[in-house]
């Protein structure tokens, strides 16, 4: 058959029509648009936040789906089509310059999000994310509401948990510094409260701890550990003042295990997030030693009870321990102040 312009045009139209039918029309007719088991509708504030998210191109850096190969936050549940029921437009993103946000709801408190949107470096000094302060307070609140919606019913449970513990954390903070620290320590399991830091606070370990502190903790707890970092003005309760811990050691000698547990798990209800997905064990112990030495002026590193030292550890005597008489005087002063 001779190829003529007429045949070419008709053939092209038929191929195009077949493609559209197979890829658009038939799926649209046969596809069941049903919500997933965790889906919940957005309220007006959350819808406004979704529009802000889309209009400002947040999906250029963040995705909204969990894949079968994912291992990080939200990986407990793989994304399903019904999760995005009635989401218009359903822009899921393809890049992960920033973290996936499909299960962001309840991961952080509202005040953490406010500080983060005003300046992402306030909550993560290494963040590449631009500041969204220009949006204004109302739009930041709407965007925060949308963040807290992501995860749907699973997010609702996490948000409720944050709100429950926030009330208790604020009450403890208002009771005074020492009462606040006592309450915070009571939330740590006993075996952790009575556990010293098992690793020596060597010069190298403190240098590593300082680097971690500057990269993760600086803008909340401040350069001198007094809880007056740049983000503190947005947080209620504010970040902990480490310099008050020396008179609040567990059994007047332990602090390492408390640091480790609270850095690993965060303090739900406050802006203190968990770091168990970002920092492996040695880094948490190192930053614990750094905070203890530089801001508390004391570390329980390598005191009893202790096990066998790791093969790479150098011999090290703890120069930051107080003599028994000084420890006794500190305890008596604490009692007199109550």
Give the location of each predicted region.
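Cytosolic-side transmembrane helix boundary signature
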Residues: 1-7
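Hydrophobic membrane-insertion alpha-helices, especially the h-region
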Residues: 9-25
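Short extracytoplasmic
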Residues: 40-73
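Mid-length scaffold segments of soluble, non-membrane domains
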Residues: 97-104, 230-233
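Periodic glycine anchor positions in long extracellular repeat architectures
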Residues: 222-227, 266-269
């Amino acid at each position: 058959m001779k190829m003529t312009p007429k045949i070419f045009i008709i053939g092209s139209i038929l191929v195009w029509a077949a493609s559209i039918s197979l890829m658009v029309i038939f799926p649209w007719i046969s596809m069941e648009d049903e919500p997933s088991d965790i889906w919940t509708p957005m309220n007006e504030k959350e819808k406004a936040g979704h529009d802000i998210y889309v209009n400002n191109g947040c999906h250029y850096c963040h995705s909204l789906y969990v894949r079968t190969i994912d291992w990080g936050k939200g990986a407990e549940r793989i994304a399903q089509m019904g999760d995005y029921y009635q989401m218009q437009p359903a822009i899921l993103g393809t890049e992960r310059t920033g973290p996936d946000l499909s299960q962001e709801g309840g991961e952080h408190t509202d005040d953490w999000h406010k500080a983060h949107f005003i300046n992402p470096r306030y909550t993560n000094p290494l963040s590449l994310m631009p500041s969204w302060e220009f949006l204004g307070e109302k739009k930041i609140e709407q965007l925060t509401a949308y963040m807290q919606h992501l995860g749907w019913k699973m997010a609702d449970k996490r948000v409720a948990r944050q709100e429950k513990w926030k009330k208790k954390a604020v009450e403890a903070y208002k009771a005074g510094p020492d009462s606040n620290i006592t309450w915070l320590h009571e939330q740590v399991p006993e075996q952790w409260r009575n556990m010293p830091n098992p690793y020596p606070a060597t010069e190298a370990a403190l240098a590593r701890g300082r680097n971690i502190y500057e990269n993760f903790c600086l803008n909340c707890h401040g350069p001198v550990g007094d809880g007056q970092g740049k983000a503190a003005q947005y947080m209620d309760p504010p970040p902990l003042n480490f310099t008050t811990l020396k008179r609040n050691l567990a059994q007047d000698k332990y602090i390492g295990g408390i640091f480790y547990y609270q850095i690993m798990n965060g303090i739900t209800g406050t802006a203190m997030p968990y770091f168990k997905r970002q920092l492996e064990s040695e880094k948490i112990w190192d930053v614990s030693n750094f905070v203890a030495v530089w801001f508390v002026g004391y570390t329980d590193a390598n005191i009893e009870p202790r096990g066998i030292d790791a093969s790479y550890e150098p011999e090290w005597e703890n120069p930051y321990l107080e003599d028994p008489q000084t420890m006794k005087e500190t305890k008596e002063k604490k009692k007199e102040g109550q």
